[in-house]
Amino acid sequence: MLRSNAITQGIQRSPNRAMLRAVGFDDNDFNKPIIGIANGHSTITPCNMGLMDLANRAESALKEAGAMPQTFGTITVSDGISMGTEGMKYSLVSREVIADSIETACNAQSMDGVLAIGGCDKNMPGAMLSMARMNIPSIFVYGGTIKPGKLDGCDLTVVSSFEAVGQLASGKIDKDRLIAVEKNAIPGPGSCGGMFTANTMSAAIETMGFSLPFSSTMAAVDDEKAESAAESAQVLVNAVKNNIRPLDLLTKEAFENAISVIMAVGGSTNSVLHLLAIARTAGVDLTIDDFERIRQTVPVICDLKPSGKYVTVDLHKAGGIPQVMKLLLDAGMLHGECKTIEGKTIKEVLRDIPSKPKENQDVIRQISNPIYKKGHLAILKGNLASEGSVAKISGVKTPVLTGPARVFESEEECLTAILDNKVKAGDVVVVRYEGPVGGPGMREMLSPTSAIVGQGLGEKVALITDGRFSGGSYGLVVGHVAPEAAVGGTIGLVEEGDSITVDANKLLIQLNVEERELARRKQKWEKPKPRYKTGILGKYSRLVSSSSQGATTDQI
């Protein structure tokens, strides 16, 4: 029986049907499944500016497949545009708003399934959280990646522009060059083009079976992207008929598959936060330690930006996520029996994918010839992060540094010091009170990390924070430090000049201060007053969980 029968069947539902007739239903439509289209279209960001065409294609395809589509809007924010500002505090919050809005619309209207369309970073995990909560047949359509910008024959991404700021500050380029990069970095619609957060999460969603094979690496402007939206609609209608639900797919093994692919492609630190949140919502026992366990056995085999050479459209040409998955499957690093929204197993989906990467390309390598022998997202613990932290060590030859702490109470303070050349080789930069509660909202530190890299200090300076990093960040960066400063974490006790050790080889993040001294500082520490007492940020800071649990707000 259809869930939507609650609003379409029986004499008592005559007023409900009257409303539905006004939006296009007729006598023959009340026995059809009602499918929601959660449309994240927006012109505030290139990531989402092309989604309306995909929604229209999906709507037509749903009708052709015998369903009744109902389109509703959900929000997005632009991480790239809000980066480095107070507005960035709303980015992670938007993940919860997206999840809440999709859940609200679908459950209020008794929809039988949902096709969610998104582009910017939080669209993907937001949609997945709602799907796990509702457990109705669901599919995700990614808006697609942007094609690279070009300047002097070189590929550009949005990170190129952030790094140019640091290069200008250190005298490596002039202002004309910075403006040239600015004008060429973002050529049109699509999500940021490297293996940054949006492309990482779309890859994870494809791996877990919630979007169609190859669809997570398609370019936003290519015809195949619109065709995949139409095909996704047909697949979803079949899933409704066959009662294939999200919790059937969201198993521990599916999450392990997603982590393996994220390691293999060199994906974003944000994936740790988002997968923990989705797993918690789905009732799956996934912990931050699972990421470290899998990292030890899965190599990085894709040479992708931010630390590598290529962009996501290059990965697509080289075989996309299915090619990566096939290599992992053959190496025993993937669970082949996990189900997809199509009703097939992963092994069945990958049956016709070649067992070797394509020749004449070096985007995807053999397992035996990796970029890095182990995954690039290391989970560090120690007295500075007893619940754990996430280090992204791709692009770093020696992921070990002991140095003096340079302590900043906000991202703005930190960036000013970097651009004024006050951060030197060997320093350990600490940015605190930027966590889920303290920020609130865990701002991403792309501006400081890009400035450090732009000044040539990416190998020589460590940056640790209870906030987050953009998928575009690389270097010796450690985020998601938990417990965070605002709830009494040790990061809040660090003083200027303290010795800190970051050692990714030993999985250690340690404040080299005697326990007696730390106890004295802890006794003197006072919980800061909340930066926001009202509005969504005030509400968020009161509800949000630790980053080690995914920073969710709905489990009280």
UniProtKB/Swiss-Prot annotation:
Its EC number is 4.2.1.9. PANTHER family: DIHYDROXY-ACID DEHYDRATASE DAD (PTHR21000), DIHYDROXY-ACID DEHYDRATASE, MITOCHONDRIAL (PTHR21000:SF5). The active site is at S470 (proton acceptor). The keyword Amino-acid biosynthesis applies. This is Dihydroxy-acid dehydratase. HAMAP family: IlvD (MF_00012). Disulfide bonds: none annotated. The modification N6-carboxylysine is found at K122. The keyword Ion transport does not apply. [2Fe-2S] cluster binds at C47, C120, C192. Binds 1 [2Fe-2S] cluster per subunit. This cluster acts as a Lewis acid cofactor. Pathway: Amino-acid biosynthesis; L-isoleucine biosynthesis; L-isoleucine from 2-oxobutanoate: step 3/4; Amino-acid biosynthesis; L-valine biosynthesis; L-valine from pyruvate: step 3/4.
